[in-house]
Amino acid sequence: MKNKALFLDRDGVINVEKNYVHKIEDFEFMDGIFETLRYFQEKGYLLIIITNQAGIGRGYYTEEQFHILNDWMLSEFEKEGIYITKVYYCPYHPEHGIGKYKRDSFDRKPNPGMILKSQKEFNIDLSKSILVGDKESDIQAGKRAGVNVNIIFSNNKNGDELDCCKKINSLSELVSLIL
């Protein structure tokens, strides 16, 4: 039997968007994230994070710093009884990357690479899955991969001008939208 997944962008969906968050002291969970993820976990969704991390490519922080923050974030979720299936990240940037990080990548949203990797790794039925992002590139990745429901979290100006998909203004709206 195939799994269904809730795909989540990180910055701007799981945590408050700040410029290139890479330190624990700068990481602030979005209001309602724990309750929302707990609900979807209880409904049998795999919880998968897909995040572009151009700050690595630009040299603002290292992959090691990303992993330290990521491990802390996952432990905070676990304290709340929430288990993230996997975090996929893309450190590359085609224009502003430095050294080995300056390249295009099929994993970099709006490309669907991270979603398609997870589909294969966890036997995911994308037609029964949901993606939540806060930028058009998130939604494009979901659509290109064949994710059935793509939702823009328009808690900021990025989502307000888009006519691409369903919109929510708070994470609590996600639960009622899917019911």
UniProtKB/Swiss-Prot annotation:
Biological process according to GO: carbohydrate metabolic process; cell wall organization; S-layer organization
UniProt-annotated catalytic positions: 9, 11
Pathway(s) where this gene product acts: Nucleotide-sugar biosynthesis; GDP-D-glycero-alpha-D-manno-heptose biosynthesis; GDP-D-glycero-alpha-D-manno-heptose from D-glycero-alpha-D-manno-heptose 7-phosphate: step 2/3; Cell surface structure biogenesis; S-layer biogenesis
InterPro entries in alphabetical order: HAD-like_sf, HAD-SF_hydro_IIIA, HAD_2, HAD_sf, Heptose_bisP_phosphatase, Histidinol-phos
GO terms, molecular function: D-glycero-beta-D-manno-heptose 1,7-bisphosphate 7-phosphatase activity; magnesium ion binding; zinc ion binding
Main location: cytoplasm
EC number(s) given by UniProt: 3.1.3.83
Positions with a binding annotation for substrate: 9-11, 17-20, 51-54, 108-109, 135
Family that this chain belongs to: Belongs to the GmhB family.
Record-given protein name: D-glycero-alpha-D-manno-heptose-1,7-bisphosphate 7-phosphatase
